[in-house]
Amino acid sequence: MSRLSIFPDETAANAPDGLVPQLESNDPAVIQASLSRRGIGFEQWPAEHGLPEGADQATILQAYADAIAWVQRDGGYFTVDAIRMTPNHPDREPLRRKFLEEHTHAEDEVRFFVEGCGLFVLHIGSEVLSVLCERGDLMRVPAGTRHWFDMGSQPRFCAVRWFNNPEGWVAQYTGSSISQRFPRLD
């Protein structure tokens, strides 16, 4: 079940007894409204295409072709791919370290979770919003939004990704250590 937790950004440094969220909800309507007020897109789509376990990129993209085309037209994204992470992926540890550092992008970060889950953490103004995304969740993080992503120490997810940069995922790291002070996926 998807979950949103909102913390003040200074909480981690000042809370000896741990972090206490200002808001915590599993209600999709509350999640969508709370994120929308902060300029973040969140939708839940059916993920019912009955893909075979370990489906390759071509199979995934074909199964979701209509939805992918709609998002491409709506956002002007001309590149799309699918990423699959598993506990035995050879690059899981370096990728996790890279994704866990607070960063921004010059373009929107748009992800649809075909299976599994991941934790997007957004640093917006004086708040930190932790969004557990699961199968069927679509997140749109606007360009320039400070954030990090945790796929967990034993990742298991597949997500469709949209880009308007032909180079794909390109991060500008902020140099902040804030991501080390907030809860992770596991």
From Swiss-Prot:
GO molecular function annotation: acireductone dioxygenase (Ni2+-requiring) activity; acireductone dioxygenase [iron(II)-requiring] activity; iron ion binding; nickel cation binding
Recorded metabolic or biological pathway in which this protein acts: Amino-acid biosynthesis; L-methionine biosynthesis via salvage pathway; L-methionine from S-methyl-5-thio-alpha-D-ribose 1-phosphate: step 5/6
Cofactor: Fe(2+); Ni(2+)
GO biological processes: L-methionine salvage from methylthioadenosine; L-methionine salvage from S-adenosylmethionine
Enzyme class name: oxidoreductase
Enzymatic reactions: 1,2-dihydroxy-5-(methylsulfanyl)pent-1-en-3-one + O2 = 3-(methylsulfanyl)propanoate + CO + formate + 2 H(+); 1,2-dihydroxy-5-(methylsulfanyl)pent-1-en-3-one + O2 = 4-methylsulfanyl-2-oxobutanoate + formate + 2 H(+)
Site (May play a role in transmitting local conformational changes): D108
Cofactor binding, per record: Binds 1 Fe(2+) cation per monomer.
Gene3D superfamilies cross-referenced by the UniProt entry: Jelly Rolls
Site note May play a role in metal incorporation in vivo, residues: E102
Keywords: Amino-acid biosynthesis, Dioxygenase, Iron, Metal-binding, Methionine biosynthesis, Nickel, Oxidoreductase
SUPFAM superfamilies assigned to the protein according to its UniProt record, in alphabetical order: RmlC-like cupins
Family in the record: Belongs to the acireductone dioxygenase (ARD) family.
Subunit (UniProt): Monomer.
HAMAP family: Salvage_MtnD
Name of this protein: Acireductone dioxygenase
Organism of this sequence: Synechococcus sp. (strain CC9605)
